[in-house]
Amino acid sequence: MRPAPALALAALCLLVLPAAAAAAAYFGLTGREVLTPFPGLGTAAAPAQAGAHLKQCDLLKLSRRQKQLCRREPGLAETLRDAAHLGLLECQFQFRQERWNCSLEGRTGLLQRGFKETAFLYAVSAAALTHALARACSAGRMERCTCDDSPGLESRQAWQWGVCGDNLKYSTKFLSNFLGPKRGSKDLRARADAHNTHVGIKAVKSGLRTTCKCHGVSGSCAVRTCWKQLSPFRETGQVLKLRYDTAVKVSSATNEALGRLELWAPAKPGGPAKGLAPRPGDLVYMEDSPSFCRPSKYSPGTAGRVCSRDSSCSSLCCGRGYDTQSRMVVFSCHCQVQWCCYVECQQCAQQELVYTCKR
C-alpha cells in the first residue's frame, strides 16, 4: 500500500459566486457561477507571502462587501477555500447512495429551483463556513479572532495548554455580516434560502460541546481547564441529512399583524386551516424534486452508478436493473483526519463484485 494524497475535489476548485449578487450573497456550494480552478493557498509546501491574501481575495468572485472583508483578514481566503471543500465533501458523503449524489454537474440548475436538494446545499454550505471559521480562529490562522471566550483563560495560556476553544461566537457574527441580511426580503425564494442557511448555522451550534482537561502531577486534576469544542463536521452533516429527509414544503402567506410575507406549510387534514409556519430547524422547499434518474440540467442521472445489491440498487437504478462484474477495486483505507477539513488516506485494493446501474 502506498500513501495517498489528501482528498481533493475538482483539483481544489473553489466554489464562487458572481460579483453582482447583492440580493443573494452566498458562498460555497450555493455560489451562482461555475467552478473556477483555484490554486493551493499558503500551505506548508508553499507558504503564503506577505500581501498574497489580497491577490487570493481578488481571485474570488465575491460581492463588494465580501471582498472588502476578505482583504481585511489575511487568513480568510484560505478559510473560505477550506469551507467550500468541507461542504462539498460532506454533501457527497451524505448522498453517496442517493439518486442525486451532490454531483457538481447540474449544481447551477439546482440553484435556480426550490427543490429539497437546493435547501440542503444552502444549509451545508453555511454550516461548513461556520465550522471552518470557528476552527480557523482557534488554530490561530485568523488575525481578527482567537480562541473562544473561556472564563479565566487567556488566549496565550490556552494555546500553551493546547486547549484553545473553537470560536463559534465570532464565526456566527462574522458570517451574518459576510452573507448579509436577507430575512426581511419580500421574495419567497430569498426567504427560503435565508431560512435554510440559518438551519445550517443552527446545526453547527447544536454540536458545540464543553471539553475539560486536567493539569497536575501524575495525572491528578489539581487544575482543570475547560473550553468549547465543535463536534466533528460529519455529525453536523448527519443532522442536516435528517433535516433533508423530513424537509417541509412551503408556500407564502402574508402575516396581517406584521404586514410581511412569511413561509407557511400547507394545511393538513385535521390541522389549522392555513397550516403552520415551519420550525427553525426545518429545511424548507417549494417544488417537488425530479427523479434524477436520467441526465438533465439538474444531474447526470444514475446510469453507471455503483450500487449495493442488497440495499440501494433497486431505488438507485430506477427500475432499469444493474450489471454485475468482478474487478479490482481500489479504495481509501486507514484514513486520518488532518485538522478540520482534510482526510489523509492510504490506498488499498481487493477483488470484489461490483454492481452498476444499467443505462
Curated annotation (Swiss-Prot):
SMART domains: WNT1. Residues 1-23 form the signal peptide. GO terms for molecular function: co-receptor binding; receptor ligand activity; signaling receptor binding. InterPro entries: Wnt, Wnt_C, Wnt_CS. It comes from the Eukaryota. Keywords: Developmental protein, Disulfide bond, Extracellular matrix, Glycoprotein, Lipoprotein, Secreted, Signal, Wnt signaling pathway. It is found in: Secreted, Extracellular space, Extracellular matrix; Secreted. Its main location: secreted. Palmitoleoylation is required for efficient binding to frizzled receptors. Depalmitoleoylation leads to Wnt signaling pathway inhibition. Disulfide bonds join 91-102, 137-145, 147-164, 212-226, 214-221, 293-318, 307-313, 317-357, 333-348, 335-345, 340-341. Belongs to the Wnt family. PANTHER family: PROTEIN WNT-9B (PTHR12027:SF84), WNT RELATED (PTHR12027). Ligand for members of the frizzled family of seven transmembrane receptors. Functions in the canonical Wnt/beta-catenin signaling pathway. Required for normal embryonic kidney development, and for normal development of the urogenital tract, including uterus and part of the oviduct and the upper vagina in females, and epididymis and vas deferens in males. Activates a signaling cascade in the metanephric mesenchyme that induces tubulogenesis. Acts upstream of WNT4 in the signaling pathways that mediate development of kidney tubules and the Muellerian ducts. This is Protein Wnt-9b. The gene is Wnt9b.
